[in-house]
């Protein structure tokens, strides 16, 4: 019947989801607890550069928080 295809769809869906989740967790682990940011547009690149300058350690993923910005 039609429901015999459900296990195959579940396996295929799981195989498609695992790489995306693994990538997010690897980026969080390597970038100090934050996901990797991707700049597809110039505006996003400018925001990442601003965060890099504000952090003081030349890394965009290290945030100081608004209360610590001079």
From Swiss-Prot:
The chain crosses the membrane at residues 1-21. One of its GO terms (cellular component) is respiratory chain complex I. Pfam families: MWFE. The keyword Oxidoreductase does not apply. Keywords: Electron transport, Membrane, Mitochondrion, Mitochondrion inner membrane, Respiratory chain, Transmembrane, Transmembrane helix, Transport. It is found in: Mitochondrion inner membrane. Its main location: mitochondrion. It is a single-pass membrane protein. The keyword Transmembrane helix applies. InterPro entries: NADH_Ub_cplx-1_asu_su-1 (IPR017384). PANTHER family: NADH DEHYDROGENASE [UBIQUINONE] 1 ALPHA SUBCOMPLEX SUBUNIT 1, NADH-UBIQUINONE OXIDOREDUCTASE MWFE SUBUNIT. Belongs to the complex I NDUFA1 subunit family. Accessory subunit of the mitochondrial membrane respiratory chain NADH dehydrogenase (Complex I), that is believed not to be involved in catalysis. Complex I functions in the transfer of electrons from NADH to the respiratory chain. The immediate electron acceptor for the enzyme is believed to be ubiquinone. Complex I is composed of 45 different subunits. This is NADH dehydrogenase [ubiquinone] 1 alpha subcomplex subunit 1. The gene is NDUFA1.
């Amino acid at each position: 019947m039609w429901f015999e295809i459900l296990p195959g769809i579940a396996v295929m869906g799981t195989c498609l989801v695992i790489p995306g989740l693994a990538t997010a967790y690897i980026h969080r682990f390597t970038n100090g607890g934050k996901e990797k940011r991707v700049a597809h547009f110039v505006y996003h690149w400018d925001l990442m550069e601003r965060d890099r300058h504000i952090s003081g350690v030349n890394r965009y993923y290290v945030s100081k928080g608004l209360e610590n910005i001079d």
